[in-house]
Amino acid sequence: MSFTTTVKEELIHLSASDQTELSAIIKLAGSLGLANQSLNLSITTENAKIARYIYALIEDTYHIIPEIKYHQKTNLKKNRVYTVYLDKQVDKLLADLKLADSFFGIETGIEQQVMSDDDAGRAYLKGAFLAAGTVRDPESGKYQLEIYSVYLDHAQDLAQLMHKFMLDAKVIERKNGAVTYLQKAEDIMDFLIIIGAMSCKEEFEAVKLLREARNDINRANNAETANIAKTITASMRTINNIIKIMDTIGLDSLPVELQQIAQMRVANPDYSLQQIADSLDFAITKSGVNHRLRKINKLAEDL
């Protein structure tokens, strides 16, 4: 099951909001038809549970019994498209939800009452996501939540509504409409809270934190590997210089304090400067070891 489906199935198990939610669903997933000189309304979805939810929402709100139809896009079961079909009292429903102008392209944005009321705004966002929303699985590490609108005006109003809830929503035009989207993980989690998908918000956050922890561990491991490689490279340079001294003037020609450092370095090529300092039988700091190794390198280079 996709994360989008998980979110939507959590939403339909919440108590239905109100007519505002139904209004958003119909506006984004509905289409009008004409048969026998009367209007009919079709609301489409690819999820049978959402179709039943819309059916119940219409029945409970308006005491009208719709039909649920379905057809196959292909031979695969998952490509079924479900339609909640209504051919009675469509005019009344559209008028009550103030949707008539929307379907005839006269008023394609979001009603001002929804834009100005927080509860109505939450209900509208819930309905909009149920009808036309998608969200990437947080496991992908590429965070994106989108709601598709047929009209650019509606997509822009949707972004403005999200801005009211302090979400950094943006709009992009597509070939057959426009998309309102969020790309920040924190915004997506806040959106899930706003529409009531608390369990999915917790799941999203847990996956995000786990990914970040894994990335931190990988970065630390990479840094440690790089430091080890750097230590060994520097160590081999010094060891080659010590061998050069041994072959030319002999190690005994060096001061005692340099001889001890040289012997420790040759015996332990993978030791860090601190490990060399800790292994000597006299007190010396990490910088002291580094200073003496630089002296050895300089002596070898001058030979």
From Swiss-Prot:
Residues 272-303 bind DNA. The keyword DNA-binding applies. It comes from the Bacteria. Keywords: Cell cycle, Cell division, DNA-binding. One of its GO terms (biological process) is cell division. GO terms for molecular function: DNA binding. Involved in cell division and chromosome segregation. This is Probable cell division protein WhiA. It comes from Streptococcus equi subsp. zooepidemicus (strain MGCS10565). The lineage of its organism: Bacteria, Bacillati, Bacillota, Bacilli, Lactobacillales.
